[in-house]
Amino acid sequence: MKLTMFVVGLLGLLAAPGFAYTVNINGNDGNVDGSGQQSVSINGVHNVANIDNNNGWDSWNSLWDYENSFAATRLFSKKSCIVHRMNKDAMPSLQDLDTMVKEQKGKGPGGAPPKDLMYSVNPTRVEDLNTFGPKIAGMCRGIPTYVAEEIPGPNQPLYSKKCYTADILWILRMSFCGTSVETY
């Protein structure tokens, strides 16, 4: 019995690193002064991707929950969390993101320009985070959280509200806009 438990424990230690990993991407992320570092953690078992952008006060963290089709971005300078539906036409699948991250490792911007997604942030705070699933609820719990709706592509140039932009690995640019971006 002890030998069986030892073998199972050893297999668990050897198999666990295969389920989730982190890739660090250094370079210009397009935010503020162009310095910083992004890291992407992909967990295929839980169907989530976690993107961390470390850039001082303009740092942010984004969680893409492929299981529930919601994404959340925590803006540290705004001390808030913004939740939105994932646009599966613009946001890569978990498998494609995995491939893109591996291809971008150690490289700077290049290739096609990033896809643009623009969101209008509703200024009303979210009361029940559980509607977005346990992963996003856990990330946004305890901080003001707002819901954002995607602004259709043709209307983007006409939208003149203040925006906070998050560039993700030179493949996707997400802008969160509203009437008072300073508050969220």
UniProtKB/Swiss-Prot annotation:
Which purpose does this protein serve, as stated in its record? Has mitogenic activity and may be involved in maintaining the integrity of the gastric mucosal epithelium.
Subcellular location(s) of the protein: Secreted; Cytoplasmic granule; Golgi apparatus
Return the Pfam families for the record: BRICHOS
Q: Could you tell me which PANTHER family the record lists for this protein?
A: GASTROKINE 1
Q: Mention one GO molecular function.
A: growth factor activity
**Highest taxon of source:** Eukaryota
So which tissues is this one expressed in? Answer: Expressed in the stomach. Highly expressed specifically in surface cells of the antrum mucosa from where it is secreted.
- Name the species this protein comes from: Mus musculus
Q: Where is the BRICHOS domain?
A: 54-148
Protein family (similarity comment): Belongs to the gastrokine family.
Q: Which cysteines are joined by disulfide bonds?
A: C81-C140
- Specify the signal sequence span: 1-20
Q: Which UniProt keywords apply?
A: Disulfide bond, Golgi apparatus, Mitogen, Secreted, Signal
GO BP, one annotated term: positive regulation of cell population proliferation
Q: What is this protein called?
A: Gastrokine-1
PROSITE patterns attached here?
BRICHOS
Q: What are the leading ranks of the lineage?
A: Eukaryota, Metazoa, Chordata, Craniata, Vertebrata
- InterPro entries reported for this sequence: BRICHOS_dom (IPR007084), Gastrokine (IPR051772)
- Look up the record and report any one GO term of the cellular component aspect: Golgi apparatus
